[in-house]
Amino acid sequence: MKEIVESYFKQRSLVNHQLASYNDCIPLGDGSLSRMEKIVRSIRIGEDEPIEDDEGGMIKLDVLDKEIIVRMKNIRLGKPTVREANGAEHPATPMETRIRKLTYFSPVYMDFKIVRDDKPLPDEEESVHIGNLPIMVRSARCNLHQ
């Protein structure tokens, strides 16, 4: 019986289900839609009628009798890096961040486009750093992932 249990845990990690859930949520950069991207694309604020399109999430604002629509999509994660005091950056490892009491995180970027009814063409789509996401060790975005 002991051999069976040892064999099972050699093939599967104790935290395999947690890694799978985390990897399902985060954008992997392989072109597939992550759960995070699906949530962003499903956002509809200020719109009464459900709209199905590929333009991404939408926030509709009425400001001073002008309609402004903010479209958002393509959420992305960068690789975990450490920024030193002098501005230099290098790839982070979980051990380095733990020893230096830093957070092991990746920057999160998303594309935004603003459409105004008083302008004939929408503004250019712009990638914006919206925050940082802690990275789970050995996840698909971890620098130790093979």
Regions found by a protein language model. Give the residues of each.
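Conserved N-terminal architectural modules of multi-subunit, DNA-dependent RNA polymerase core subunits
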Residues: 1-145
